[in-house]
């Protein structure tokens, strides 16, 4: 088996694990276990928090002491067992405690799998995209498998429900632990990566345009969790009516669109419109999606609007990493990438998870959740971000100042 094939399988399993539970866990927490919106948000906030902490844990182990494939195997095996145990947790305290430990184990593998792939590819700049896309395919496959599992199990209630998404993720994690021993040997580096390296890039914030860009990115990232946490419960509500068995498969529409936009849309848009206009399309797509959710009708339009995730995520967040790589001075480029990852994928999503959960509580009564009220909040905030971006952000000036 070629190294590329083994790396592709690694990425497939890495994101199949995440894709098995992340899109639908909130439905289980809110509807089956009776957690509040804030409690569900707090559980989703654990992975972004672990992402911030992971450079101090798994990254240091792999960089200094052990080969990366062995660290991945240990983390995934232990994490898989924890997920299976977590599937039987019913109290908030037990669920939160188990999930926090699990997230501390899983978060380092996100960076480690990228590192293993890049180190073992002959031309990582050209070949990494073709390997990474298997991660998104794995996410989609997990959703389809969970839907199939639920359909075979009767669709609701029954043997296959409960914490089934955590069982599936746990099983995939154990399989990945075994597959890790087939990965190319990746020994530890002589010098570890500094976990505080992102601080070196803070001087870039002196540039007005870059500071505006980071501020807008942070606010938009907080609103991402309204999609990840609340879309599942919203689609399964009476107003939309997606069944529990079909929900995981329906949610994969977003990732299918992400693959399409990544493969065909992003490079075309960057060449035709440039960085600023591409980012603008991405940030404007956010309030469009949330206003469709807020109206909540017709149901087919709400479901179809999941495809906007391709533009929301790829044209803004993926393009944002490309922009930072473009404007950062060469000597702090890696630090700048670490900074935007912490701002957008760490702190932003951590606070956004808590915020989304709290907003869901505010608009929930004994009669149910007012989804119009819920989604008007991220609609208003992302609209403000879009207006601020169009009025104040200028790519050319930002690039010059940051450099």
Where are these regions (language model features)?
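Juxtamembrane intracellular "pre-TM" segments in multi-pass secondary transporters
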Residues: 1, 183-216, 237
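Helix-to-loop junctions at the C-terminal end of transmembrane segments
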Residues: 53-67, 150-154, 261-275, 360-361
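Conserved MFS/SLC helix-loop-helix module at the cytosolic interface between two early adjacent transmembrane helices
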Residues: 53-90
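Multi-pass alpha-helical transporter architecture, strongest
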Residues: 86-87, 173-184, 376-403
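Structural signature of the two symmetry-related core transmembrane helices
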Residues: 70-84, 277-292
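Hydrophobic core of transmembrane alpha-helices in multi-pass small-molecule transporters
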Residues: 12, 82-86, 92-112, 116, ...
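A membrane-interface helix-boundary motif in multi-pass transporters
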Residues: 148-172, 358-382
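Helix-loop boundary and gating motifs at the non-cytosolic
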Residues: 1-48, 209-250, 317, 353
